Swiss-Prot record:
Pfam families: Cytochrom_C. SUPFAM superfamilies: Cytochrome c. This is Cytochrome c. Electron carrier protein. The oxidized form of the cytochrome c heme group can accept an electron from the heme group of the cytochrome c1 subunit of cytochrome reductase. Cytochrome c then transfers this electron to the cytochrome oxidase complex, the final protein carrier in the mitochondrial electron-transport chain. GO terms for cellular component: mitochondrial intermembrane space. Binds 1 heme c group covalently per subunit. It comes from the Eukaryota.
Length: 105
Protein backbone atom coordinates (compact mmCIF):
# COMPACT_ATOMS: atom_id res chain seq x y z
CA UNK A 1 0.00 0.00 0.00
CA UNK A 2 1.30 3.44 -0.87
CA UNK A 3 1.69 6.65 1.08
CA UNK A 4 -1.14 9.15 0.44
CA UNK A 5 0.97 12.26 1.16
CA UNK A 6 3.77 11.13 -1.14
CA UNK A 7 1.11 10.29 -3.73
CA UNK A 8 -0.26 13.82 -3.50
CA UNK A 9 3.22 15.15 -4.32
CA UNK A 10 3.46 12.80 -7.30
CA UNK A 11 0.03 13.96 -8.49
CA UNK A 12 0.94 17.65 -8.16
CA UNK A 13 4.30 17.17 -9.90
CA UNK A 14 3.29 14.80 -12.67
CA UNK A 15 -0.50 14.76 -13.13
CA UNK A 16 -2.12 18.03 -12.02
CA UNK A 17 -1.12 19.94 -15.14
CA UNK A 18 -3.60 17.81 -17.12
CA UNK A 19 -5.93 16.28 -14.50
CA UNK A 20 -7.97 17.24 -11.45
CA UNK A 21 -9.56 15.06 -8.76
CA UNK A 22 -12.04 17.71 -7.66
CA UNK A 23 -15.56 16.32 -7.35
CA UNK A 24 -17.58 18.17 -9.99
CA UNK A 25 -14.48 19.90 -11.34
CA UNK A 26 -14.01 20.68 -15.02
CA UNK A 27 -11.92 18.52 -17.31
CA UNK A 28 -8.50 19.86 -18.25
CA UNK A 29 -6.36 18.48 -21.08
CA UNK A 30 -7.08 15.11 -19.46
CA UNK A 31 -10.28 14.00 -17.76
CA UNK A 32 -11.28 14.81 -14.20
CA UNK A 33 -10.31 11.73 -12.19
CA UNK A 34 -13.02 12.12 -9.56
CA UNK A 35 -14.94 8.85 -9.35
CA UNK A 36 -12.18 7.00 -11.23
CA UNK A 37 -12.28 3.75 -9.26
CA UNK A 38 -14.94 1.41 -10.59
CA UNK A 39 -15.41 3.40 -13.81
CA UNK A 40 -14.65 1.87 -17.21
CA UNK A 41 -12.02 3.40 -19.47
CA UNK A 42 -13.22 6.29 -21.60
CA UNK A 43 -16.32 6.97 -19.52
CA UNK A 44 -15.84 10.30 -17.71
CA UNK A 45 -18.91 12.23 -18.81
CA UNK A 46 -18.18 15.23 -21.00
CA UNK A 47 -14.59 14.30 -21.91
CA UNK A 48 -13.61 13.50 -25.50
CA UNK A 49 -11.70 10.20 -25.44
CA UNK A 50 -9.92 8.37 -28.23
CA UNK A 51 -11.56 5.24 -29.61
CA UNK A 52 -8.72 3.26 -28.01
CA UNK A 53 -9.71 4.47 -24.53
CA UNK A 54 -13.41 3.90 -25.15
CA UNK A 55 -12.94 0.38 -26.49
CA UNK A 56 -10.35 -0.87 -23.96
CA UNK A 57 -13.23 -1.95 -21.74
CA UNK A 58 -11.40 -2.38 -18.45
CA UNK A 59 -12.59 -1.06 -15.12
CA UNK A 60 -10.23 1.23 -13.22
CA UNK A 61 -9.09 -0.35 -9.99
CA UNK A 62 -5.79 -0.68 -8.16
CA UNK A 63 -4.30 -3.36 -10.42
CA UNK A 64 -5.38 -1.85 -13.74
CA UNK A 65 -4.04 1.55 -12.67
CA UNK A 66 -0.74 -0.01 -11.57
CA UNK A 67 -0.22 -1.47 -15.04
CA UNK A 68 -1.47 1.63 -16.88
CA UNK A 69 0.62 4.10 -14.90
CA UNK A 70 3.80 2.18 -15.64
CA UNK A 71 3.40 2.67 -19.39
CA UNK A 72 0.09 4.21 -20.57
CA UNK A 73 0.76 3.90 -24.31
CA UNK A 74 1.66 0.22 -23.98
CA UNK A 75 -1.47 -0.58 -21.95
CA UNK A 76 -3.83 1.45 -24.15
CA UNK A 77 -2.21 1.88 -27.58
CA UNK A 78 -3.77 4.94 -29.19
CA UNK A 79 -4.39 6.85 -25.95
CA UNK A 80 -3.82 10.58 -26.29
CA UNK A 81 -2.19 10.75 -22.86
CA UNK A 82 1.34 11.92 -23.58
CA UNK A 83 2.74 11.03 -20.15
CA UNK A 84 5.44 8.35 -20.45
CA UNK A 85 4.55 6.66 -17.17
CA UNK A 86 5.87 6.17 -13.66
CA UNK A 87 8.76 3.72 -13.72
CA UNK A 88 9.21 3.61 -9.92
CA UNK A 89 6.89 1.09 -8.29
CA UNK A 90 6.81 3.17 -5.10
CA UNK A 91 5.59 6.26 -7.00
CA UNK A 92 2.82 4.23 -8.64
CA UNK A 93 1.75 2.80 -5.28
CA UNK A 94 1.78 6.24 -3.65
CA UNK A 95 -0.18 7.83 -6.50
CA UNK A 96 -2.77 5.05 -6.45
CA UNK A 97 -3.17 5.46 -2.66
CA UNK A 98 -3.74 9.19 -3.18
CA UNK A 99 -6.20 8.64 -6.02
CA UNK A 100 -8.06 6.02 -4.01
CA UNK A 101 -8.52 8.51 -1.20
CA UNK A 102 -9.28 11.63 -3.25
CA UNK A 103 -10.88 10.33 -6.44
CA UNK A 104 -13.47 8.17 -4.71
CA UNK A 105 -16.92 9.02 -5.94
Amino acid sequence: MGDVEKGKKVFVQKCAQCHTVENGGKHKTGPNLSGLFGRKTGQAQGFSYTDANKSKGITWQQETLRIYLENPKKYIPGTKMIFAGLKKKSERQDLIAYLKKTAAS
